[in-house]
C-alpha cells in the first residue's frame, strides 16, 4: 500500500485483523493470506512484523475461509456506468473498519477478519472492497463476511461518485451512527438469514 494510504493492524480480544483504505488495486488472495497468518494470542508490532514471521502461520484449526469481493458494475438505476470515484476521510474510515472487525469478533469469536476498501478512480470490473474471514466452521466465516459488508455500507465514511453516460452523481453513502444498536441488529439479521 502507498505510504499515504491507511493500513492498520488491530488487536481485539484474542486475535488480530487487518483493515485498510487504499488507492492501490485490491488483492483478495493477499488479504486472505494475511488473515490466515494472524495467530490468536500473539501480539504483532505492525503489518510488517506479520510478514517477517513465517513461523506465525496459523490455520490448523480453521476449516473455512470465506471471501467477498465487491466489483464496479457497468450499470446502475437504468444508466450505463463509465467508472466510479471513491473518496474517504481515511483515518475515520480505518477506525470504522476496525470497529466492524471488533463487532464481528464479539458475534463470532473464532473468526479472524480482514477488510480493505479502495479509493480513487475505479473502472468497470475493478474490486472496490474485499473481505476475508477465516474460522473453524464455514457458517461463522460466511456470517462474519456478510455482516462486515453490511456494516461497511452502513457506517464507513467512504463516498462514491458515479460517472455515467451523460453525467455524474454522488450516491448516498454510510448514514448510520456506528453506535446505533438497531443498525447493528439489521446487519446481524441479514448476515444470519
Model-derived features with residue positions:
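Intrinsically disordered, low-complexity tandem-repeat regions
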Residues: 2, 45-46
Amino acid at each position: 500500500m502507498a505510504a499515504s494510504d491507511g493500513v492498520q493492524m488491530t488487536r481485539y480480544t484474542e486475535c488480530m485483523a487487518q483493515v485498510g483504505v487504499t488507492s492501490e488495486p485490491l488483492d483478495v488472495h493477499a488479504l486472505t493470506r494475511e488473515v490466515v497468518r494472524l495467530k490468536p494470542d500473539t501480539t504483532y508490532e505492525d503489518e510488517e512484523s506479520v510478514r517477517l514471521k513465517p513461523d506465525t502461520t496459523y490455520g490448523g484449526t480453521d476449516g473455512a475461509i470465506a471471501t467477498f469481493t465487491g466489483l464496479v458494475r457497468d450499470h446502475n438505476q437504468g444508466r450505463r456506468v463509465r467508472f466510479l470515484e471513491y473518496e474517504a476521510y481515511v483515518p475515520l474510515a480505518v477506525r470504522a473498519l476496525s470497529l466492524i472487525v471488533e463487532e464481528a469478533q464479539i458475534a463470532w469469536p473464532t473468526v479472524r477478519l480482514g477488510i480493505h476498501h479502495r479509493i480513487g478512480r475505479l473502472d468497470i470490473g475493478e474490486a472496490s472492497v474485499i473481505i476475508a474471514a477465516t474460522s473453524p466452521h464455514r457458517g461463522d466465516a460466511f456470517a462474519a463476511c456478510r455482516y462486515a459488508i453490511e456494516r461497511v455500507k452502513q457506517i464507513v465514511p467512504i463516498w462514491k461518485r458515479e460517472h455515467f453516460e451523460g453525467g455524474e452523481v454522488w450516491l448516498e453513502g454510510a448514514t448510520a451512527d456506528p453506535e446505533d444498536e438497531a443498525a447493528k441488529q439489521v446487519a446481524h439479521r441479514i448476515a444470519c438469514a
